[in-house]
């Protein structure tokens, strides 16, 4: 079985989230992935927990932020696909399968994202995907809006052909 995906989790003092995050990844229906945690110099017991649970981890000496950590993870990944997660995430059992299915639909797709629902308010969106204006301004779709409004992909049923 070929591993196709590396799931990179940035962690900084996130021990209180780690167990639930890892358990949700262990429950995936798609088996062809590896989990790699990049720890940003945690001091809350995360380092010991990751070692005790034998989680594949790169330990950084200081906090490099989310982008610094995931960039280290991306450089270490040896798979065609990478998924980037924060440590305070729980995913449903089809998450990896759906992400791999979505990106595999066309060689022209270079990035996919999922709906993110607020953990403590599961009827509200945290993020329904990043959007960019023609002027290059970035914004998040759906923040704080009802989750039920974001069931379909933003461009569901629309084909865009190059000129």
Predicted regions and their residues:
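Conserved short acidic donor-positioning loop in nucleotide-sugar-dependent glycosyltransferases
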Residues: 13, 25, 40-41, 64
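Acidic helix N-cap motif at the loop->helix transition within catalytic regions
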Residues: 44-52
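Short aromatic/hydrophobic "clamp" motif used to bind/position activated sugar donors
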Residues: 82
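Conserved donor NDP-sugar-binding/catalytic core segment of glycosyltransferases
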Residues: 90-133, 137
């Amino acid at each position: 079985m070929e591993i196709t995906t590396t799931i990179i989790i940035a962690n900084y003092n996130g021990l209180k989230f780690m167990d639930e995050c890892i358990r949700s990844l262990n429950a995936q229906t798609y088996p062809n992935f590896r989990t790699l945690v990049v720890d940003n110099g945690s001091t809350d017991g995360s380092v010991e927990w990751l070692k005790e649970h034998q989680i594949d981890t790169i330990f950084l000496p200081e906090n490099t932020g989310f982008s610094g950590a995931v960039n280290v993870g991306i450089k270490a990944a040896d798979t065609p696909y990478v998924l980037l997660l924060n440590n305070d995430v729980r995913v449903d059992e089809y998450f990896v399968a759906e992400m791999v299915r979505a990106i595999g639909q066309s060689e022209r797709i270079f990035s996919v994202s999922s709906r993110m629902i607020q953990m403590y308010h599961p009827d509200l969106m945290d993020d329904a995907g990043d959007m960019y204006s023609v002027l290059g301004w970035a914004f998040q779709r759906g923040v704080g809006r009802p989750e039920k409004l974001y069931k379909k992909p933003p461009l569901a049923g629309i084909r865009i052909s190059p000129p």
